[in-house]
Amino acid sequence: MTYRDCFFYALALAGFVGCAASCANLMSCELPDTGRVTVMSYNTQTFFDADECGNEFDEFKGGKSAWSEERYLARLDRLKEAIVLGGEASGMCPGVGPDVVVLQEIENAGVLRDIGGRFTSAGAYPYAAFVPQESGGAFSIGLLSRFPVVAVRAHQTVSGGVFLRPLVEAVLDVRGTELTVFAVHWKSKSGDESSAELRLEQEVLLDRRIRALEAVCPGALWIACGDFNQTMDEFTVLSGYANGWNSFAVSESEPVLSSAVVSGKSTSGIPVSGLSASGVCGSYYYNGAWEGIDHFFASCSLVDGSDAEIGGFRTVYGGRLLASSGEPARYEIFSGKGYSDHLPVVIAIEAWN
C-alpha cells in the first residue's frame, strides 16, 4: 500500500450565480447569520453529464442508451430539489440548501458548475471544489460552499497498483474560523472479500490525516463525511470519534429543525434504535434492511460542549426522495425517473461565531 498526495485548486463559482455583470451583487447577498453552519452529504448515484467521454457506465453511453441532454437537465433539477430538502431538514430558509454540500459520484467539474448554476441570489454557492478522478475513473467527489475554500488537497491510497477513490481535504473559511472538511467515497462491498481490506486502508488514511491536522493545530474544527460503504460496527480506527449515528443523533420526540429554530441545541435526527415514523432508519436500503453507511464524524472540539457544537444529525427523506415502497427512489435510466439509491444526511453546527 502506498499513498499519493495531490493538491487541487478550488473553483470560484462567481459565474454560476448569474451574468457577469450581476455576479458581484449576488455574491454580496447574505443569508441571515443565525450562528449555525449546515452541511449535507449525498451520494448522487452515477451523476454523469450529457457528453459522452467513454468512462461512463455502459447504460449511459452508445446510440442505444436512453441517456440524453433532456434527462441530464431533469436530473440536475432533481438534485437541486434534494439539496433544498437538505436545507429545510437542517433549518435553512425555504428554498435554500445547506451552507456546504458534499456530493459523491459526480462525473466532473462541469456537473458541479451546472448544479451550482441552479442556485441564485442569497442561496447561491459562490465556491466549489472538485478533485478529478484518476484516468479511466467514472466519477469523483465535489463540494459546494457559501464559505471561501481556502485550500483543497487530495490523498489517495494505492493498493495493488489500483488507485482507490481520493480522500478530499478542503479547508473552509467560515466567518473567520477554519473548518476542515474531509470527504470520502470508500470502496463498495460489491466484488470479492478484499473490499473490506481496501476500506480499512482508506480508514487508516483518513485517521492519519485527522491526526496530522490535530498535531499541527490542536483543537482544530473538522468533520469527515461521505459514503463510507459500511456501518458503525464495521469501523476500526475511526470508532473512537464522534459519529452522527450514535453521538449526535437525537430522539424522535425532539422537535425537527426548521427555519424557526435558529438558536440553542434543539435539533432532530433519525434514531438508530428504532424506525422513524416513516419507517426510515438509515441512508441506504439493502437486502430488505436499512443501513447507515453515509456518515458524519466530528472533532472533539465540536462535541465537547464549548463554543461551536454539533447540534444534530438526520437523514433527509422528504419530498419524493422515497419511492412508494418506502425505499430510496433510486434513479432508473430506462424510465428517467428517480433521484438516488442513497438518502442525504445533514448536520447543523450551532453557536458558530
Residue ranges of predicted features:
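Bacterial N-terminal signal peptides that target proteins for export
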Residues: M1-A10
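Bacterial N-terminal signal peptides
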Residues: Y9-A20
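N-terminal, active-site-proximal structural segment of metallo-dependent hydrolase catalytic domains
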Residues: C23-R118, A129-E134, A323-K337, E350-N353
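Metal-dependent phosphoester-hydrolase catalytic domains
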Residues: A24-S28, R208-W222, Q230-N353
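Active-site beta-strand/loop signature of hydrolases that rely on acidic residues for catalysis
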Residues: V39-T44, Y72, L79, I83-L112, ...
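Structured beta-strand-rich core segments of catalytic domains in phosphoester-bond hydrolases
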Residues: T44, V100, I106-K187
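Short, solvent-exposed loop/turn and secondary-structure capping segments
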Residues: A50-G54, L112-R118, S140, R153-Q156, ...
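Metal-dependent phosphoester/phosphodiester hydrolase catalytic core
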Residues: C53, D173-R208, E214
